[in-house]
Amino acid sequence: MRGAGGFFAALPSCPPPRAPEVAPAGRAQIRAAREGDLAQIAAIWNHEVLCTDATTDTEARDPIAQREWFARHTERYPVVVATLASADPDRDGPVVAYGSLSPYRPKPAFARTAEDSVYVARDHRGRGLGGLILVELIRRARMLEHHSIVARITARNAASLRLHARHGFREVGVERESAFKLGRWHDVAIMQRRLDAP
């Protein structure tokens, strides 16, 4: 990873989640991601890469790679974050979840289908933040005139499967043992929501 220096040596291990010390999703704010959020987004992402099968990616992102990832998310493929309320009204609280839309496939025929990603910091799960992020991604996808959203979810990720089902996604296929990570093969469920459906 270019220019990372000691970045990867400093990556944390995989501790168990702690009980949240902050209020639940009712106090969270959803907004477009900014460059100043990238370190916190990377911290959430890198934990999932290194410690879980929630993503099939296997390489953590250094700061350069994280900026390049953000630059690829043009207006048509937004990134949104959930931040917690801050005691200072002029400053955001910490980023505790994020989500993004990405191109589903590079071929032009797929230009109006997006793929979503939703990640919640490990110490803030089970508090509705993933739902807030997904609702905002659906809203923005409609505004951008996408026709459908696809999610590819490892079959053991029950929380993400339930989240997407609650928000109108339906399973349309399963890739059997298509991903190998953390010493085992994983099935990958494909879920889809058409945006012209209720």
What label would you give each PLM region?
Residues 141-153:
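Conserved GNAT acetyl-CoA-binding A-motif
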